[in-house]
Regions:
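An acidic/histidine-cluster motif and surrounding catalytic segment
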Residues: 1-71, 75-197
Length: 197
């Protein structure tokens, strides 16, 4: 996977099962430049999730990488031509490229397998260009500041709060999605979840 400089995956220290799972998935596309981001644990799991993505983006900025893939540790690739579908995204000048999506609304491109994103939820897998990291960081920090002040609300969850960026910037998605979150125990929701996306 030559187009991606590094893969960062978010994982809570005690979730050894998920660590093993996500490394297996990442090794389907690369065996180099893989970095574990120690997830932030909070009683409010959604807050911890948002802070963990901020931590991953900050880590990416500390390095000279131009393009980074960020994965949550329950992400699972579908058995399709993974590399080919990821490479298709790089035919477009994107800020963020989504590998998975939920409630996707889009406009067509000149390729049936790539869509211009208008709306999507889930932060389970995305490729981000270095120049865009400060923009997404600012958006996520604002969401987490609101969550710390006002508690969890739909509009301050990071995968909702980032939607306005999709309307004004260059967000693209693999279509159909090339991965999903596998069903397992969620530390965020404190129970079994199978999102199907």
């Amino acid at each position: 996977m030559e187009s991606i400089d590094a893969v960062l995956y978010i994982n809570l220290e005690h979730r050894k099962d998920r660590n093993e799972h996500i490394l297996h998935e990442i090794h389907k596309i690369t065996h180099k430049n893989i970095h574990r981001i120690d997830a932030v644990k909070r009683d409010n799991g959604v807050l911890g999730c948002g802070l963990s993505h901020i931590k991953a983006l900050e880590y990416a900025l500390e390095h000279e990488w131009k393009t980074v893939l960020i994965l949550e540790d329950d992400f699972t690739f579908k058995s399709i031509s993974i590399d080919d579908h990821i490479e298709l995204l790089f035919n477009y000048d994107f800020d963020v490229g989504l590998l998975s999506h939920n409630v996707l609304r889009y406009s067509d491109t000149d390729n049936d397998f790539v869509k211009r994103v208008i709306y999507s939820q889930t932060t389970s897998s995305y490729i981000i260009k270095r120049d865009y990291i400060p923009v997404l960081l600012q958006n996520m920090r604002k969401a987490m500041k609101d969550m710390e002040k006002n508690g969890r609300r739909t509009e301050n969850c990071i995968d909702i709060h980032w939607v306005p960026l999709m309307l004004k910037d260059k967000w693209y998605a693999s279509y159909p999605e090339i991965g999903y979150q596998y069903g397992n125990h969620s530390d965020i929701e404190q129970g079994f979840r199978e999102y199907g996306c």
